[in-house]
Amino acid sequence: MSTNSFFAKFLRFIGIVLMALTGGFTFLGGVGTFCAAVFPQKYESMAGLIPYQWLYILFMLGTIAIGVWGIWAAIKLIKGTTDAYWMSLYALIAGVLVGGFHIYMSRMLRGKSMPVDAVVYTTLLTLVIFLLFKIPMIWQGVDFSKAKASDNKKAGGAAAILVGLFTLTIQYTMGSTHTWGGVNYADAFNTSMAVIGIGLLLLGAGIFVSLRNVRETALRLQVQQ
């Protein structure tokens, strides 16, 4: 498979977008564990977590760290660095292991584990796809370090917009699993999430605008020649 073939570009695009979404989702999942980790005594459904509060604080910090790791890996994929793929793979494996243990403990202590499940299943899907990328025939074309920077930047722009939209709507998409006593705690960091979400939307739009300007400039130079 050629590095510049449509299929190779498509797979790289999917890989970068999925990695960025997974990193962002994991980070937000870690932030969303704050209430259960720091104030389990405030919620009747979290009473079983009180003796293990220290563990849930570790889950929260670990998940946030893995989320940042995943986002950093996605940025490296966009830049096409030689260590980008393996960094992504290690971050995904860490996410599955820590998230899987989190699911096990939550189901054992309080009988359910949502929304951790959604984060782990997303991470597992991305991990499977990245493992498939390493099949020799596929990797020959997908290899992120050999791609044109402009192709990867398109995926980066799309990823920034999608993560931005997800950040802006997290209080609605996760409201059902974060509502106790009629209060939606997924909306606890509304201002911060709004600022981050809008910032990501502007970043994504800016990337596409800059790529368009570069393309138009290149076309004008060709015409002049």
What positions do the PLM features span?
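Topology signature of small-to-medium multi-pass alpha-helical membrane proteins
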Residues: 1-225
